[in-house]
Curated annotation (Swiss-Prot):
Assigned protein family: Belongs to the protein kinase superfamily. Ser/Thr protein kinase family.
Pfam families in the cross-refs: PK_Tyr_Ser-Thr
Membrane topology summary: Lipid-anchor
One cellular component term from this protein's GO annotations in UniProt: plasma membrane
Protein name (record): Serine/threonine-protein kinase BSK1-2
Annotated catalysed reactions: L-seryl-[protein] + ATP = O-phospho-L-seryl-[protein] + ADP + H(+); L-threonyl-[protein] + ATP = O-phospho-L-threonyl-[protein] + ADP + H(+)
Active site per database record: D205 (proton acceptor)
A Gene Ontology molecular function term of the record: protein serine/threonine kinase activity
InterPro entries: BSK, Kinase-like_dom_sf, Prot_kinase_dom, Ser-Thr/Tyr_kinase_cat_dom, TPR-like_helical_dom_sf
Chain ranges of the Protein kinase domain: 79-338
Record key words, sorted: ATP-binding, Cell membrane, Kinase, Lipoprotein, Membrane, Myristate, Nucleotide-binding, Plant defense, Serine/threonine-protein kinase, Transferase
EC number: 2.7.11.1
Gene that this sequence comes from: BSK1-2
Species annotation: Oryza sativa subsp. japonica (Rice)
Amino acid sequence: MGCCGSSLRVGSHAPEKPPRRARPPPPPPQPHHPRRPSFTLNAHQAAASSSAASAAPAPAFAEFSLAELREATGGFAAANIVSESGEKAPNLVYRGRLQGAGGGGRAIAVKKFGKLAWPDPKQFAEEARGVGKLRHRRMANLIGYCCDGDERLLVAEFMPNDTLAKHLFHWENKAIEWAMRLRVAYNIAEALEYCSNEERPLYHDLNAYRVLFDENGDPRLSCFGLMKNSRDGKSYSTNLAYTPPEYLRNGRVTLESVVFSFGTILIDLLSGKRIPPTLALDMIRSRSIQAIMETNLEGKYSIEEATTLVDLASKCLQYEPRDRPDIKKLVSILQPLQTKSEVPSYVMLGVPKPEEVPKAPPAPQHPLSPMGEACSRMDLTAIHQILVSTHYRDDEGTNELSFQEWTQQMRDMLDARKRGDFAFRDKNFKQAIDCYTQFVDVGTMVSPTVYARRSLCHLMCDQPDAALRDAMQAQCVYPDWPTAFYMQAVALSKLNMQSDSLDMLNEASQLEEKRQKSIKGP
């Protein structure tokens, strides 16, 4: 494939083959250090762990080395941080992928604690093993831990479809439908009941950020809330307005405290926003149900179901712990409210349909960056997160606009790109394609990042031919941009052109290596 100059735009047809560079000799093989299993599940626990048909069962709990987790997270790269507060979070959570024969490419979430959180490594390991014995389809299960010097890390199943907080409070295109909200409440109540039955009843800081959505869009409860910071004993990191009254009095968490926090989640589901419990109770007592319901749900829910949920939330938020219902009562009340059981969660949540894992291309010949690793694994979700986090950093210098060119048409074009960015961030890939196409069609400004993002959108919509065209367009705009080659590698693999895909991966890694050397200097 020939390269175009950065000032030219090319047609939409795809050349027959992408460009190739000379292949360097492969590096010597690296030894693999397998994980050390701590224990295996008994038959009863294994049966309890059966999840949705398309979801892989959680592996046995294991102890990991720091080197393994560093490799899995790309050296704890900032691009792999998935904590809601980003790098400002006190305990960072990273996306990762287990490498080597023992890892099997499994996606993981790695929680990295601050150095003073768990001073006693034995206490940390014992607590982690206790939580690691739990296995349930309604939970993002803990699959391992790491104690290395001052480092304390937990390893859990990775949930790729964000948090309940993200879907409730930060949506741009579509509010969660009513039946899905009822499903969330029921699934989390089931998870809490399971933990209680397994003698792990205390869940710390239960809130909408602890509710995660798996590859099928099913809601799951994060296992991280089953462990607390052992040094300061804090169980609630959120605003004190949302903590149980008894915790403010004596600093202790009880099963009734967990029920109170569950009540705050019910209020979140009803209102679509964070309302302090005292204010929510005042609204419930003095006004109609409609006052607390999210306006986007108007006319889309059953008054009887909403009344039941509001009444249950009110009981959970009672000041006196003895006046709150127990976990079993929550489950029994929420179970009859479940509707649309035949509709998959991913449909109601509005996330892409889960697919079988595509065949990955052969291993490249160079060490890869997080972007390269994601592309070599065909991990479209990881690629999406990286493209969101890098934003338009690589577009600098590709366009220089004079004052005369800053027209209303230009403003409209940038507005289309902005709308595309919002849709891309929120995984509304079809809308992102439409908005980015409006931007591209004007032609005043050429952005390699827009082509890369639209390429990924096409991949998410099972359009590999269009994805390859856009990745090649990105290369034409920015001939030595590694991301353009990486996106071509993914599209080629989707088109079953594995040899060409490997060439693209190697070429991209060479470009990245060359870029790093130029930054460091001689």
